[in-house]
UniProtKB/Swiss-Prot annotation:
<feature type="compositionally biased region" description="Basic and acidic residues">
    <location>
        <begin position="1"/>
        <end position="98"/>
    </location>
</feature>
<dbReference type="InterPro" id="IPR032472">
    <property type="entry name" value="ArgoL2"/>
</dbReference>
<feature type="compositionally biased region" description="Polar residues">
    <location>
        <begin position="317"/>
        <end position="326"/>
    </location>
</feature>
<keyword id="KW-0694">RNA-binding</keyword>
<feature type="domain" description="PAZ">
    <location>
        <begin position="540"/>
        <end position="656"/>
    </location>
</feature>
<dbReference type="InterPro" id="IPR014811">
    <property type="entry name" value="ArgoL1"/>
</dbReference>
<keyword id="KW-0611">Plant defense</keyword>
<keyword id="KW-0810">Translation regulation</keyword>
<dbReference type="InterPro" id="IPR003100">
    <property type="entry name" value="PAZ_dom"/>
</dbReference>
<dbReference type="Pfam" id="PF02170">
    <property type="entry name" value="PAZ"/>
</dbReference>
<feature type="compositionally biased region" description="Basic and acidic residues">
    <location>
        <begin position="167"/>
        <end position="180"/>
    </location>
</feature>
<dbReference type="Pfam" id="PF16488">
    <property type="entry name" value="ArgoL2"/>
</dbReference>
<feature type="compositionally biased region" description="Gly residues">
    <location>
        <begin position="181"/>
        <end position="214"/>
    </location>
</feature>
<dbReference type="InterPro" id="IPR045246">
    <property type="entry name" value="Piwi_ago-like"/>
</dbReference>
<dbReference type="InterPro" id="IPR036085">
    <property type="entry name" value="PAZ_dom_sf"/>
</dbReference>
<keyword id="KW-0687">Ribonucleoprotein</keyword>
<feature type="region of interest" description="Disordered">
    <location>
        <begin position="1"/>
        <end position="277"/>
    </location>
</feature>
Length: 1194
């Protein structure tokens, strides 16, 4: 099948007959109310029910005969119809969908847009785009409804692409781009391509491109591709860019649902009612065939600003025929094949895990309400601060809204333990209420649905495979209600208002926590982890400036550049103390003049004084009785939208909870913050236990108890199995292979007396010394090169003396043209003096980190095909000598970059592969721009192994795609490039591929399975290549941590879990295939396990095999002599994507080279530049053919 399409065949029910390309074309015969069709969104053949007969081009043209109430038709570009329509539909034809010819025994539209009636009809009206319609007169819709109602005039099983009984893609009254009885692009109850909670191929509240309360590809109230109410990569959590509440139905990953019986939907819904005329009809791809809408006397329709309002009677529940769900090709994550691993292990250890079990009654119900708050000026966006103030006032003034029984997400959703009044409420603030003085708002609240906790328990028990994200979202908001009122909220984290650590320049750090809800084997778990973040102090602006700039007094302002002050203050929030108000203002800048020199035109609106010029000093004295002490400095501009509002600095105070970016921390403070964050496992354990019991924490207050939730204050305990380390293949000093059996708890090996598996031959190489003009302490010593050669030889490499040695200065790195010229001179000299030789390697000595490093890498690797190895003299030189460990690490990188291998597994076919198998490992990652960068592209990197069975050499492909797009575009083509690099002959292609995907959350699994993996399969299928593929996601950004319950063997205090600790019980998913593996040895801080999730497994690994495979691969990372935390295909993909970011920033620096010479612009400022490199410039990321299959990126 091609992207979910169906080819040929017969559809015997209300589903589909046919096939086609991209899942929307159908051929053959559909004998129910489905479709007959063929082509790309086009249809041919015969449809014998209420569906369509048809065919044509681009999926909206139809030919042939439609014998039901569907269409007969055909034509060009899907909007013209020819032939005969025998029902209430259309006979017609023409070009581009606006003219119709032929005969239809019902209402038929002729070419000119008029209506003719060649036969009897029980139907109503059908309209085409751009034609005149005859419609029943509009009737009044109740004020509480914001949606259109569907006309009674449209016949059952209405033609068009819309309606219940619809054969299109959408929901009630809407299919494709149409509405009720509408063949145009808009209609009643129509929102673009959206149906009732259904978008694209989704169902009610499904994850298509949007739904009721859904924006993106995800679940309830979600924006992006993630989980419940989450915008980034998270699960249940934050609301992001937009959210319109929850829609009806269960939420999964866009697959078929087992639908409950129809239920009544409240008449107070903001949606329109469904016409009685829509009681019957068939369903093709759309709403009911996937996720039936629940309704009885009325139902909800999506909002549409373009809909015409037409009233009608409503259909009774008995008239609604819910068809059987259609089959779906959508893949779901594979289920766990066994009860977990039981492989031979070093031992079993008892662990505490920072998961706290949440108990609840399955009889409990959480009521979900949609909130819409409107101000007097409907076009003005209402801030979250205003939303909170309005909600609080209404709940305070109206006893029917109990605060203690509700949780508010700060935007559109309220969850309640009791029933709340619905409707429209006026909220007026009096003139004495300073912040919101005299403002009026309308608070509209409507019940969306009742969230049954029984649905969540059914999922946890495995009785349902569709995660109720709406229930999880409601519970998550409830859990966060109490801490959000008492702590500083930063995304999904909560921090104390007290800064416990003082960095000394107006900045300190506060402790906090992050928590998420996770369905697990043991039930619902609250995962709680400690956190630390730097904030500006909530002090006066003048005091802050004195601390930040190190001034003894404010008079030193004159010695500072105003731009430096503006750069630090702009965008910060302040309150003022010259009047009684809690209102927050944003600093927009400084006044050009000092306070004493600012005058303005004063107009007394009460008419007591004539207009006059007045100074700021006089005004504050007269108006507020306040003298200004610091008149010789500028005022702050707190105005907005071009209106200046100057306020003396001494009256302004910084609002608490304003983050200080860690990249702006002084070096000592940054190191201190990092050190504080890297707490020992014992310290982290104690911090978390304090937080779970804190009155400010997630268990604090009465709110969760009022919803019937209880959080166990004790951590979950589990058993961890410690896997045995693999035996490694190294060499002795003579180059003979040896087997290294690792016995230590850390699983590290030592190369002091041993060598790498395959040492490279480096005969022609060069040295570029950028430290030649530096002081003696920073300069590369003359002995360094000889020491490096000696260490490389000790590891089994054959390295001769360099054939080219050139000196330069760090200043050269500022000039891209000069740098390229220098590198070309190295190539020319080597070629000229050594018989056309090209340097295998260029060693570059630098004094410290420099943006010119990016330019050097970009030029060398994309333009010239040079492998470079940079090093910092300040790191390499310790006293009068160079560190042997540093030289060894440098040598390992060099060996890998030029084609050698550093370590190999003895059991490199992992015993569970067959001897005839050819296996390839692929890793994929997407590198996104910094948070403040709204322009730069995301960088994709895909890496793949080049050798089997060693599987320790990789090639990488790097490219750019749309800003912050996580879905890898052209994933199949990129993987195919790597397949070709792996094996030139078809018979040598791998028959088994394991793809490791990094950087995706649970809510993006659908994207990986049904978009990225499908794209790979489609590309492979075109060349007749059909390997077995297993897809595994590696998740790093989670909060789960393990704490050993006993001391280690050597008797030291409680530390990290041993390398190889795996957990695949209790805290994992109830039935899907995941586990936690802590492969690394944690020497600093608390080890973070990697969460591995098997999404698809055609190879058929059991738990023992997949755990051993991943753990063993972690020993093959080329840069170190210990197992790494993340499986190498993912680690390499991450490094290659970072290298792509380096290329992009180097290209921007070149484009922005008009900036003052010597100013080292940060990548952030460059990336935000208006002169952003276009996405079409693919050459930026195209690695030179000479090195693209080498590991240049390590």
């Amino acid at each position: 099948m091609d992207r979910g399409g169906y080819r040929g065949g017969r559809g015997d029910g209300r589903g589909r007959g046919g096939g086609g390309d991209r899942g929307r074309g159908y051929s053959g015969r559909g004998d129910g109310r489905g479709r007959g069709g063929d082509g790309d969104r086009g249809y041919s053949g015969r449809g014998d029910g209420h569906g369509r007969g048809g065919g044509g081009d681009r999926g909206r043209g139809y030919s042939g005969r439609g014998d039901g109430r569907g269409r007969g038709g055909g034509g060009d570009r899907g909007r013209g119809y020819s032939g005969r329509g025998d029902g209430h539909g259309r006979g017609g034809g023409g070009d581009r969908g606006r003219g119709y010819s032929g005969r239809g025994r019902g209402f038929v539209q002729d070419r000119d847009g008029g209506w003719v009636n060649p036969g009897q009809s029980s139907g109503g009206h059908v309209r085409g785009r751009g034609t005149q319609l005859q419609q029943p007169p509009p009737q009044e819709v109740p004020p509480s409804s914001s949606q259109a109602q569907v006309s009674q005039g449209v016949a059952p099983g209405d033609v068009g692409q819309g309606g219940v009984g619809d054969v299109g893609r959408d929901g009630v009254g809407d299919v494709g781009r149409d509405g009720v009885g509408d063949v145009g692009q808009g209609g009643v109850g129509d929102v673009g391509q959206v149906g009732v909670g259904d978008v694209g191929q989704g169902g009610v509240g499904d994850v298509g491109q949007g739904g009721v309360g859904d924006v993106g590809r995800d679940g309830v109230g979600d924006v992006g591709r993630d989980g419940v109410g989450d915008v980034g990569r998270g699960g249940v959590g934050d609301r992001g860019q937009s959210q319109s509440g929850l829609s009806s139905g269960h939420f999964g990953r866009g697959t078929q649902l087992q639908q409950p019986q129809p239920q009544a939907v409240s008449q107070s819904s903001s949606q329109g009612q469904v016409s009685q005329s829509f009681a019957t009809g068939g369903v093709g791809l759309g709403a009911w065939a996937r996720k039936p809408q629940l309704f009885s006397d009325s139902t909800v329709l999506p909002s549409s600003s373009s809909s015409n309002v037409v009233a009608s009677h409503t259909a009774s529940g008995s008239q609604v025929m819910t068809p059987k769900p259609s089959s779906s090709d959508k893949k779901e994550p594979v289920k766990r094949p066994d009860k977990g691993g039981n492989i031979k292990v070093k031992g079993v250890i008892n662990l505490s895990v920072n998961h706290f079990r949440v108990s609840f009654s399955t009889e409990s119900v959480i009521r979900h309400y949609d909130v819409d708050i409107k101000g007097e000026n409907s076009s003005k966006k209402i801030s979250r601060f205003e939303l909170a103030m309005v909600k609080e006032k209404l709940f305070k003034d109206n006893n029917d809204f109990p605060n203690a029984m509700t949780a508010y997400d700060g935007q559109k959703n309220i969850f309640s333990a009791v029933e709340l009044p619905t409707g429209s409420f006026k909220v007026d603030f009096s003139e004495t209420e300073e912040i919101m003085r005299g403002r009026s708002y309308t608070f509209i609240i409507k019940q969306v649905k009742e969230l049954k906790l029984l649905d969540l328990q059914a999922y946890i028990d495995g009785r349902s495979t569709f995660i109720p994200r709406d229930v999880l979202q409601g519970m998550d908001v409830v859990m966060k209600e109490h801490p959000s009122k008492r702590m500083i909220t930063v995304g999904k984290r909560f921090f104390s208002t007290r800064l416990e650590i003082d960095f000394g320049y107006g900045v300190g750090a506060a402790k906090g926590f992050h928590h998420t809800l996770k369905p697990t084997v043991q039930g619902l778990s609250l995962c709680l982890n400690s956190s630390l973040l730097a904030f500006r102090k909530a002090i006066s602006v003048i005091e802050y400036l004195k601390l930040y700039f190190g001034w003894r007094n404010i008079r030193q302002f004159k010695n500072c550049r105003p731009d430096d002050v503006v750069q630090e203050l702009i965008g910060l929030k302040v309150t003022v103390d010259h009047r009684k108000t809690k209102q927050k203002f944003i600093i927009m800048g400084l006044s050009k003049d000092d306070t004493k020199d600012i005058k303005f035109d004063f107009i007394d609106h009460a008419g007591n004084q004539p207009p006059r010029k007045i100074s700021i000093v006089e005004y504050f004295k007269e108006k507020y009785g306040r003298d200004i002490d610091h008149k010789d400095i500028p005022c702050l501009n707190l105005g907005k939208k071009g209106r200046e509002n100057f306020v003396p600095m001494e009256f302004c105070n910084l609002v608490e909870g304003q983050i200080f970016p860690k990249e702006k921390l002084y070096r000592d403070s940054a190191a201190w913050l990092k050190e504080l964050s890297l707490v020992t496992p014992q310290q982290r354990l104690e911090n978390i236990n304090k937080m779970i019991k804190s009155s400010d924490g997630p268990r604090g207050g009465d709110i969760i108890g009022n919803f019937g939730l209880r959080v166990d204050p004790n951590m979950t305990t589990v058993e961890g199995r410690v896997l045995e380390a693999p035996t490694l293949k190294l060499t002795d000093r003579r180059g003979n292979p040896i087997h290294e059996k690792l016995m230590s708890e850390s699983n590290q090996w030592n190369l002091t007396t041993k060598g790498v598996t395959k040492g490279s031959i480096i005969k022609h190489w060069a040295v570029l010394d950028f430290t030649a003009s530096e002081s003696l302490k920073k300069k590369m010593p003359g002995y360094f090169v000889n020491k490096l050669i000696e260490r490389c030889k000790g590891l089994g490499m054959q390295m001769e003396a360099p054939i080219v040695c050139k000196t330069s200065s760090m200043e050269t790195l500022y000039d891209g043209n000069a740098l390229e010229e220098l590198l070309r001179s190295v190539i020319d000299e080597a070629s000229h003096n050594h018989g056309g030789a090209c340097p295998t390697l260029v060693l570059c000595a630098m004094t410290g980190k420099h943006d010119g490093y990016k330019t050097l890498k970009w030029i060398a690797e994309t333009k010239l095909g040079l492998v470079t190895q940079c090093f910092l003299t300040i790191s390499a030189i310790k006293g009068e000598t160079v560190s042997d460990q540093y030289l060894a690490n440098l040598a390992l990188k060099i060996n890998a970059k030029v084609g050698g291998t550093n370590v190999e597994l003895v059991d490199n076919i992992f015993s569970f592969f067959k001897k005839e198998d050819k296996v390839m490992f692929i890793g994929a990652d997407v590198n996104h721009p910094a948070a403040h960068d709204n322009m730069s592209p995301s960088i994709v990197a895909v890496v793949g192994t080049l050798n089997w069975p060693e599987a320790n050499r990789y090639a990488a492909r790097v490219k750019a795609q749309s800003h912050r797009k996580e879905e890898i575009q052209g994933f199949g083509e990129t993987c195919w490039e790597l397949i070709e690099a792996h094996s030139q002959a078809p018979e040598k292609r791998p028959n088994k591929i394991v793809i490791f995907r990094d950087g995706v959350s649970d809510g993006q699994f659908d994207m990986v399975l049904n978009v990225e993996l499908q794209n790979v399969k489609d590309v492979f299928a075109k060349v007749g290549y059909n390997p077995q593929i297993t897809v595994i996601v590696a998740q790093k950004r989670h909060q789960t941590r393990f704490f050993p319950a006993t001391t280690s063997k050597d008797g030291r205090a409680k530390g990290n879990v041993p390398s190889g600790t795996v957990v695949d019980t209790t805290i994992i998913h109830p039935f899907e295939y995941d586990f936690y593996l802590c492969s690394q040895h944690g020497a600093i801080g608390t080890s973070k396990p990697t969460h591995y999730y098997v999404l698809s497994d055609e190879i058929g690994f059991n738990s023992n095999q997949i755990q051993k495979l991943i753990f063993d691969l972690c020993f093959t990372f080329t840069r170190c002599t210990k197992p790494v935390a993340l499986v190498p295909p993912v680690s390499y993909a991450d490094k290659a994507a970072s290298r792509g970011r380096v290329y992009y920033e180097a290209s921007l620096m070149k484009k922005n080279s008009k900036q003052s010479r010597g100013a080292s612009s940060s990548s952030a400022s460059v990336a935000s530049s208006s002169s952003s490199v276009t996405m079409e410039d693919k050459e930026i990321f195209k690695v030179h053919a000479g090195i693209e299959n080498f590991m240049f990126f390590v």
